[in-house]
């Protein structure tokens, strides 16, 4: 679980987060393992939130030109 989050795709991070939630909800983890899983889950949630915000910004940057064509607005 020491994998660098920046190396994960959004989908992989979300899958890991979902698995952690299942394990925590199952109630079978030892206390130390549950705490470590909770910490990892919190980091994964922040990472996924950042990725979603980045994707939203890209979508919001798409504008429609006068001729109806779509273009990507520069984020600069």
Swiss-Prot record:
An annotated Gene Ontology molecular function: exodeoxyribonuclease VII activity
Q: Which reaction(s) are listed as its catalytic activity?
A: Exonucleolytic cleavage in either 5'- to 3'- or 3'- to 5'-direction to yield nucleoside 5'-phosphates
* Any single Gene Ontology cellular-component annotation: exodeoxyribonuclease VII complex
Q: What is its EC number?
A: 3.1.11.6
State the UniProt keywords alphabetically. Answer: Cytoplasm, Exonuclease, Hydrolase, Nuclease
Where it mainly occurs, coarsely classed, is cytoplasm
State where the protein is found: Cytoplasm
State the disulfide connectivity: none
Q: Which InterPro entries match?
A: Exonuc_VII_S, Exonuc_VII_ssu_sf
Q: Name one GO biological process term.
A: DNA catabolic process
Q: How does the annotation summarize its subunit structure?
A: Heterooligomer composed of large and small subunits.
| Family in the record | Belongs to the XseB family.
The record's PANTHER family line, in alphabetical order, gives: EXODEOXYRIBONUCLEASE 7 SMALL SUBUNIT (PTHR34137:SF1)
Protein task: Bidirectionally degrades single-stranded DNA into large acid-insoluble oligonucleotides, which are then degraded further into small acid-soluble oligonucleotides.
**Protein name as it appears in the record:** Exodeoxyribonuclease 7 small subunit
Native organism: Gluconacetobacter diazotrophicus (strain ATCC 49037 / DSM 5601 / CCUG 37298 / CIP 103539 / LMG 7603 / PAl5)
Which lineage do the record's taxonomy fields give for this organism? Bacteria, Pseudomonadati, Pseudomonadota, Alphaproteobacteria, Acetobacterales
The gene name reads: xseB
């Amino acid at each position: 679980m020491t994998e660098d989050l920046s190396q994960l795709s959004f989908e992989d991070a979300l899958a890991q987060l979902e698995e952690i939630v299942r394990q925590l909800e199952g109630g079978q983890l030892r206390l130390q393992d549950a705490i470590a899983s909770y910490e990892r889950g919190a980091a994964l949630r922040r990472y996924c939130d950042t990725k979603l915000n980045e994707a939203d910004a890209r979508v919001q940057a798409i504008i429609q030109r006068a001729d109806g064509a779509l273009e990507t607005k520069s984020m600069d």
